[in-house]
Amino acid sequence: MTLEEFSAAEQKTERMDTVGDALEEVLSKARSQRTITVGVYEAAKLLNVDPDNVVLCLLAADEDDDRDVALQIHFTLIQAFCCENDINILRVSNPGRLAELLLLESDAGPAESGGASQPPDLHCVLVTNPHSSQWKDPALSQLICFCRESRYMDQWVPVINLPER
């Protein structure tokens, strides 16, 4: 590996870390503002009703999910819809970290019936614009810029890895 190749690889790694940090910040703010929709079915309903307010679509799958044909069909349809409606898409390669970000300790707890509750479907997460004010968030702007740059390089659904904490 030449020095130039090493430098380019290092810059790409740093950029991915920055994008991952920006995504964490966006998810944290959206979670506190309750502008997140979680689940493939719930996301499809929202996209059908109000696609103009969706600013970001996250698709999360691990290696086991890659063999789930039904999930991959859902992903393909959601990706096509998002591309058609100019909604930014990111694919998250570590859904476990995404679950940590979205399901904090306060949300977790035993079901009232005494049994374990069904974990929510985190394969698709939508972030919407709050109706009260237009987001002027630098982290969201950074994600949108990253998605746009990826599309210019013909990478329509860039894959990012959320940094572990």
From Swiss-Prot:
The keyword Nucleus applies. Keywords: Cell cycle, DNA damage, Growth arrest, Nucleus, Phosphoprotein. It is found in: Nucleus. Induction: By UV radiation, X-rays, growth arrest and alkylating agents. The induction is mediate by some kinase(s) other than PKC. The keyword Oxidoreductase does not apply. One of its GO terms (molecular function) is promoter-specific chromatin binding. Might affect PCNA interaction with some CDK (cell division protein kinase) complexes; stimulates DNA excision repair in vitro and inhibits entry of cells into S phase. In T-cells, functions as a regulator of p38 MAPKs by inhibiting p88 phosphorylation and activity. Interacts with AURKA, PCNA, GADD45GIP1 and MAPK14. PANTHER family: GROWTH ARREST AND DNA DAMAGE-INDUCIBLE PROTEIN GADD45, GROWTH ARREST AND DNA DAMAGE-INDUCIBLE PROTEIN GADD45 ALPHA. This is Growth arrest and DNA damage-inducible protein GADD45 alpha. It comes from Cricetulus griseus.
